[in-house]
Amino acid sequence: MPELPEVEVSRMGISPHMVGQTIKAFVFRTPKLRWDIPQELKLLEGQVIRNIRRRAKYLLIDTDQGTAIVHLGMSGSLRVLDADFPAAKHDHVDLKLTNGKVLRYNDPRRFGAWLWCAPGESHAVLEHMGPEPLTDAFNSEYIADKAQGKRVAVKQFIMDNKVVVGVGNIYANESLFKSRILPTRQAGQVTPQEWVLLVENIKATLKIAINQGGTTLKDFAQADGKPGYFAQELLVYGKAGEPCPECGEPLQELKIGQRNTFFCNECQQ
């Protein structure tokens, strides 16, 4: 599943080709992805793309007449191509530009989304979200306060979008390992000093992943079609049974909140 770094890499990849360009037409090859594709997106035809933003794992394509909101779901990807490039299987949405280019959305599992939001309004999918992890609003004081009295596992806690957005499964596993915190520990039992380290590692891990082009495990590709290379940097994710890179003991695996969780019983407390 594309997580925050992969979505940010997609934003960085498509923005230079799209901001300032005019939308010529939308082409929908399916009426529905995760949800019905709103016909209001057609209102954006003829509009200039003013900006492309990211909020959590959503991309927001802004015009004066509203915003197209894109979620990559489990297997979605975006590429900027020549408009006459033939559509392939699973190419479900085209956003055609007047400069002869097209933003093409491919999604084999069709669990992503294209939504629309009127000017000056906020879509329901973007409400009740915590701060972005790479901003100053996400800091150890903030999250330590949020965690007081919480009995939920710390891994599940930092993956809660109401607490902080965009800390997906891969990056939660890696950050907890680097911080030597067991993912099963109750969030309320994490000390202030440990929160300082964990916040630092979450930020650092996400930044490295963005610089590496994200993590390609199966479906994700960058806007130019290239894979992300952060998978080569993974310390514990997907490595159950392999030696811990710190102590050599076999890495463990269990499920927390239905998500695969990888850790070292010796190094993490």
Swiss-Prot record:
A zinc finger (FPG-type) spans 235-269. GO terms for molecular function: 8-oxo-7,8-dihydroguanine DNA N-glycosylase activity; class I DNA-(apurinic or apyrimidinic site) endonuclease activity; damaged DNA binding; zinc ion binding. Monomer. This is Formamidopyrimidine-DNA glycosylase. GO terms for biological process: base-excision repair. Pfam families: Fapy_DNA_glyco (PF01149), H2TH (PF06831), zf-FPG_IleRS (PF06827). Belongs to the FPG family. It comes from Vibrio parahaemolyticus serotype O3:K6 (strain RIMD 2210633). Its EC number is 3.2.2.23, 4.2.99.18.
